[in-house]
Amino acid sequence: MHIVRLKISGFRGVSAADITLGRHAVLVGPNNSGKTTIIEALALLFGRDRLVRRLTEHDFHGSAPDEQARILCIATVTGFTPNDPQHHSSWFSPERGVEKWYAPNAKTLSAAPDAQHTDLAVQIGFAARFVLDELEAETIRFFVDDEATLGDPFAEDAHLRTIHTKILQELGFFLVPASRTWDKWISFSSELFRRVVATRGDMPAQAVRAERARLWTPPEGTRLEDQPGLSEIVGAANDELRALMASAPRLQLRLTSTDSDSVLESVVPHFAHGTGPTLPSQRQGTGLVSLQSLLLLMQFGKARAETGQSFVLAVEEPELHIQPSQQKRLVNRLNALCNQTLVTTHSPLVAAMFPAPDTLFIETRAGILSAKPLMDPVPAQPTNHQQHLLFAWRQKLVGALMHECVLIPEGVSDVAWLEALQTALELHQGWQDAGDGAPLLSTFVGVVPTIDAKIADTFALVSAVHARPCILVDGDNEGRGYFDAVKTSNPPPRAVVFWPQGWAMEHVVSWIAGADESAMLAALGTALGTPFANAQALTDHLLTQKSYAPTHESAAIILMGNAACRARAAQLLNALCAVLRDPLSANTPLFTRIAADSTADMHVFRFVPA
């Protein structure tokens, strides 16, 4: 069994969302885009009560719920084996769910099976309202007969068939939250560990009873109250007690409360590396500590698989605290063993491990959450450019798409220069740069690698996923042609930037060097092994090094080491960032608006070097 669709209404920052989920999906997006909201909506629907914290006003959209405010989540579940409602009486009956049929290709539901709608499905709902007089949320889980006629689940005339937790346990939904640094996951203090022990093994009752007896009645000579340094204190206390109480109680010191529960609660996980000492989990690295919950859940999943039960696992940020090779191993293992995995991540490496149709970019604007696949379907014979973006450069593409704006430059060298300059600039920040002077481009603008000047193709792919694609082109006829190819797109690029007439990125680098021309020509000549008589000579040389990364990095380091060049580069990059982020109201002397090419939806600028 697995979840194929999720609808959310009125939950936290999301007023509405309709999300299609595959067997193994990764949710990618910037901070506060709604990834955790999706995961916790699933926990509300399918998780145990302890899996989700108590709902408050802030869980309702707008954080100020009135009597009519509702949280509503509806999930569609399919994957029943066999594909016949008669074999699943716990899900389908007059007192339970209504059978529906799902079309895997069209991703729609039907009341009856047909050539498209072939997979048996059921819909589960969760609703919540905030009771103002009691200052707490009232919740309900139920089977959904018909979304269109559902109405208010809390209405007096609403006749809903509630769903019991035991039925939901058949789906086997488990959540691994991003916060997983508790060091006692593998101990009897953990409910999950107790459940795994009950499922996969047996309680070590005999060993616990023996340990309890030893702790309760320690052998003579080992009792703490008889040890030097303590015996005098204990003896004096006993003398006082004899004088005060007829029963003359005697003080004894024990390591636990001496019942079975206290023995179990005192168990602490330890780990030994090779021949090294055995150390408690709290003395281990954070990576090992954070893996404990996953280790337990994998054992739980194995037990469910052995009995033919499904196992759906939602994992927030699996990349936390572990190295890239372990990230790949972990994610691949989860995808191989679970019926369904739902992963959230900020790591391009983790996101790139999922196929393009299962890489969902999450974005929330004005309360509407969208989840768009990177590309679905992927062409059977992708173009050379699509191969580079979707396969060879998927990490770079995913990383760029996580930004507020996405910039599509004319070529790979533009990407290399922008990244090199921004990195070198950031490495020369001072304490005074925390405010308006801080370099902002890399924070808010992601740059997509573009080969062979395939701006139109790249724009088509990016605009299908991201709401803020922009383009950067050279100031020549070819650049104008690339602009003409995308300006009629629907929607068009939000912002377009031209370099000056006849300029490419290399001219811009020479312009930055011109802030202290004589010193920079000498320094760059030494670093690059070529003397430069003037700025034009530097530009000509850089144009021959378009794909040579050492030149980009060396030149950027030299330039950003000079205060005048650093100030000029910061002015340029921050002005570019301002134009791309808010082209409607951007006002900077370095970029002038081209009114003849601009429209209400597309703002065109040209760089004007000062």
Question: Could you tell me what each predicted segment is?
Answer:
Residues 1-47, 270-399, 599-610:
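Switch/communication elements of ASCE P-loop NTPase nucleotide-binding domains
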Residues 24-27, 174, 406:
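Conserved beta-strand position immediately N-terminal to the Walker
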Residues 25, 77-81, 128-132:
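Beta-strand elements of well-folded, non-transmembrane domains
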Residues 40-118:
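Conserved P-loop NTP-binding catalytic core
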Residues 47-70, 306, 342, 367-369, ...:
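Flexible phosphate/Mg2+-sensing switch loops adjacent to catalytic phosphate-binding sites
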Residues 90-207:
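Electropositive, glycine-dotted interaction segments
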Residues 165, 395-408, 412-610:
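Acidic, Mg2+-coordinating catalytic modules of nucleic-acid enzymes
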Residues 185-187, 191, 195-292, 296-312:
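Extended helical coiled-coil dimerization/tether regions that scaffold
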